[in-house]
Amino acid sequence: MSRRPNFGGMGMGNMQGLIKQAKKMQQQMEAEQANLATQEFVGKSADDMVVATFSGDRQLKDLKIDKEAIDPDDPDMLQDLVIDAVNKGIKAVDDATQASMGKYTKGLM
C-alpha cells in the first residue's frame, strides 16, 4: 500500500489554496509597486536651496538648485545641500515603500 506524503495535515486542496493566495498576493504587490512608481517624492535641503524629486522607483527626476546656493568660493556647501536633498528624497521613497509594501513583507524577514 503506498502512502501519500504528509504535508503537516494539509491536503492538496489546502496546498492549491495557498498557491492561489500567494499568486494573488504577488499581483497585489506588483500593483502597489506600479502605483509607487507613478508617484513623486521630494527631498529638500535647508532653506529649500536644493530640491530633489524622485519617482517611486527611486529614479532622480529633477534637481533644482537655487542660485543663492552657488558660491564659487564654497563648493562644499553646494555639495552638502545636494547630498542632503537627495538623501531626504530617497528616504521619502523608502518610507512610502515600507508603508505600502510592509503589509506583505511583515514576518518574512
Swiss-Prot record:
Q: Which InterPro entries match?
A: YbaB-like_sf, YbaB/EbfC
Source domain of life: Bacteria
Q: Where in the cell is it found?
A: Cytoplasm, Nucleoid
PANTHER family reported in the protein's UniProt record: NUCLEOID-ASSOCIATED PROTEIN YBAB
**Name listed for the protein in its UniProt record:** Nucleoid-associated protein LGAS_0369
Q: What does this protein do?
A: Binds to DNA and alters its conformation. May be involved in regulation of gene expression, nucleoid organization and DNA protection.
Q: Which UniProt keywords apply?
A: Cytoplasm, DNA-binding
- What NCBIfam families is this protein classified in? DNA_YbaB_EbfC
Species this chain originates from = Lactobacillus gasseri (strain ATCC 33323 / DSM 20243 / BCRC 14619 / CIP 102991 / JCM 1131 / KCTC 3163 / NCIMB 11718 / NCTC 13722 / AM63)
